[in-house]
Design a protein with these regions (language model features):
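Extracellular acidic, Ser/Thr/Pro-rich low-complexity tracts
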Residues: 34-55, 60-66, 115-117, 161
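Beta-strand-rich domain onsets/edges
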Residues: 5-6, 10, 15-35, 128-169, ...
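Signal that preferentially marks extracellular ectodomain short beta-strand elements
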Residues: 85-103, 205
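Glycine-centered loop-to-beta-strand initiation motif
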Residues: 84-88, 191-207, 213
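A eukaryote-biased signal for short, well-structured alpha-helical docking elements
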Residues: 1-13, 103-130
Length: 239
């Protein structure tokens, strides 16, 4: 059975020793959407009862701000006498207006597991997953010529996020972004500056050039936006 189920109106009628053990959506990784993307994804629900699992139904994929996605019916496969894994699919489309800006972030899976002996377990938050805005980060402004050791250089950049209403990319303001430096041959970059994006998503850091290498902007993401790194920009330091 499939359909749209709202936690606020779903009858809570669990009884017996049926349990929902695990829920995995999109292979356990966030669903990331750009300005006008659509995505198909799968989900699996593992349930257990001493008598075995007959079905998992009443699936609801929901978020705050009335976010709802429509799931398929599930298909269950017994992995032991007591436990079954039930799988299904769903999709989300920005052009079809299935998700809006205030729905980015945390989502939940509601499900009812039905046992062979008539027991069942219903959970509004049987599992959780994330639908994120796909960030974009561009580096600008590195010096194009050789600079002297110890010279101050400025590296600029732009952090953007999708606006799902207009289906365009816009600046992402008030976000902490790190500038990392990797000297030629380095095994691990080091953070040389952390700045906050301005109202238009613009970034600017001034550092002293110590050796030749590359500078990269790194955004750690948030609960509603994906992490992202810019392409590295090279800087050559003379003797």
């Amino acid at each position: 059975m499939c359909g749209i189920v709202l936690p606020s109106i779903q009858q809570q009628s669990s009884h017996g020793d049926t349990r929902i053990l695990k829920v995995v959506v999109n292979g356990g990784v966030p669903i990331e959407l750009g300005a006008s993307d659509s995505a198909n994804f799968s989900f699996s629900i593992t349930a257990e009862d001493p008598s075995g699992i007959r079905s998992v139904d009443q699936i609801g994929l929901w978020s705050n701000n009335y976010g709802i996605l429509v799931p398929s019916a599930t298909s269950c496969q017994a992995v032991s006498r007591t436990t079954s894994v039930c799988t299904g699919t769903s999709s989300v489309s920005i052009p079809k207006h299935q998700i809006f800006d205030d729905m980015a972030g945390h989502w939940f899976v509601q499900a009812t597991a039905n046992a062979n002996d008539g027991d069942k377990r219903t959970e509004d938050e049987a599992g959780k997953f994330s639908v994120l805005k796909m960030s974009r980060l561009t580096v600008f402004g590195g010096p194009t010529q050789t600079v002297a050791r110890g010279q101050s250089i400025s590296i600029s950049g732009l952090l953007e996020k999708p606006d799902w209403r207009t289906q365009t990319m816009v600046g992402n303001p008030s976000q902490n972004v790190s500038l990392q430096f990797c000297a030629n041959g380095c095994a691990k970059p080091v953070t040389v500056a952390t700045v906050r994006s301005d109202s238009g998503g613009n970034l600017l850091a001034t550092v002293r050039a110590s050796s030749s290498g590359t500078y990269t902007w790194v955004y750690p993401g948030s609960f509603w936006a994906s992490s992202v790194s810019s392409f590295p920009t090279p800087v050559t330091v003379g003797s």
